[in-house]
């Protein structure tokens, strides 16, 4: 079974259990299931599930990997369709994990593509999860890029972002 087929339930519906079962049936080590940078960790962040369900899915996926494995998988560039394009593809009936959608794909770091597509509250919870559970922190360059992305979307004020980024990144 191809890695793309293994990851599809997770990516398209947030079905972690189904993807894990597929990997086990195909005798894959979960860490090694990768398709153009997409892996269990990045697929959990990009999964087509509501913001309310997102952190639960990320946490369940994180339990499958050591801190180092999680870091390695999280930092891989992913060939994917940008979230802005996903909506129009979905309206056309094209699943963003399909072969047809790949024509619209580009290489992204997970923080480049996931935020501000996901709400600020998910970003905050994700950063706290990375710090408190996986002993990981964002570097200044990544934090600045994410902040700029949130500013560019014009849903949040600079003051609001300054307060949140200071609080979250300082460990308070």
Curated annotation (Swiss-Prot):
Protein's recorded name: Uncharacterized protein TP_0941
Organism of origin: Treponema pallidum (strain Nichols)
